[in-house]
């Protein structure tokens, strides 16, 4: 199960961003080549494990840039529309600015197209430090949006624990990946995420 994902992670080159070990992978970076079979395998497993249902989820909320392709395939499979938390300000009515800090960057994100009566599933490629998800989840809570589920493809580092401690939300992921001795290691996560 998830053979394509695991293989792509194990074959990922590792680079340093400051003190942060960063693996370069189609899921997290769009390079090397992102194969449609990999995206489909991921979306199929999200649907199988977490069962996003249009009766209980109004929108999928993904985070630019690497959450977009996962949300797109998931939207096609579930018929649930998605919105993108962007890195660019549009100035639309109701736009909410969010400050995010990760292990290797800092900046603003902008939420549009989400209202207080929405029920959403948040999806992203990876939770690592938890900084991006913390910022987005706290903003959604302030907007009085009902967060039904938080899903990432990959759990790396302590981010899921940090998100749980600070927001109460459980981040459910497909696999756990880490960098050990300059190589990516991959562990299965049981079906519950």
UniProtKB/Swiss-Prot annotation:
Places the protein is found: Cytoplasm
Temperature dependence: Optimum temperature is 70-80 degrees Celsius.
InterPro entries cross-referenced by the UniProt entry: HGPRTase-like (IPR026597), PRibTrfase_dom (IPR000836), PRTase-like (IPR029057), Pur/Pyrimidine_PRTase (IPR050118)
Transmembrane is among the record's keywords: no
Family the entry assigns: Belongs to the purine/pyrimidine phosphoribosyltransferase family. Archaeal HPRT subfamily.
HAMAP family the UniProt entry points to: Hypx_phosphoribosyltr
Annotated protein name in UniProt: Hypoxanthine/guanine phosphoribosyltransferase
Gene that specifies this protein: hpt
């Amino acid at each position: 199960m998830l053979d394509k994902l695991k293989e792509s992670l194990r074959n990922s080159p590792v680079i340093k961003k400051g003190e942060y070990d960063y693996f370069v992978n189609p899921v997290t970076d769009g390079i090397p080549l992102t194969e449609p079979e990999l995206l489909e395998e991921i979306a199929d497993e999200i649907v199988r494990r977490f069962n996003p249902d249009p009766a209980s989820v109004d929108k999928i909320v993904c985070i630019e840039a690497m959450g977009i392709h996962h949300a797109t395939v998931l939207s096609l499979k579930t018929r649930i529309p998605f919105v993108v938390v962007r890195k660019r300000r549009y100035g639309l009515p109701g736009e909410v600015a969010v400050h995010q800090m990760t292990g290797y960057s800092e900046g603003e994100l902008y939420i549009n197209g989400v209202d207080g009566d929405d029920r959403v599933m948040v999806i992203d490629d990876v939770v690592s430090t938890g900084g991006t998800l913390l910022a987005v989840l706290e903003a959604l809570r302030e907007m009085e949006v009902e967060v039904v589920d938080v899903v990432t493809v990959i759990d790396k580092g302590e981010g899921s624990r940090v998100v749980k401690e600070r927001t109460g939300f459980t981040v459910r992921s497909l696999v756990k990946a880490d960098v050990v001795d300059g190589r990516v290691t991959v562990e299965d996560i049981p079906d519950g995420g």
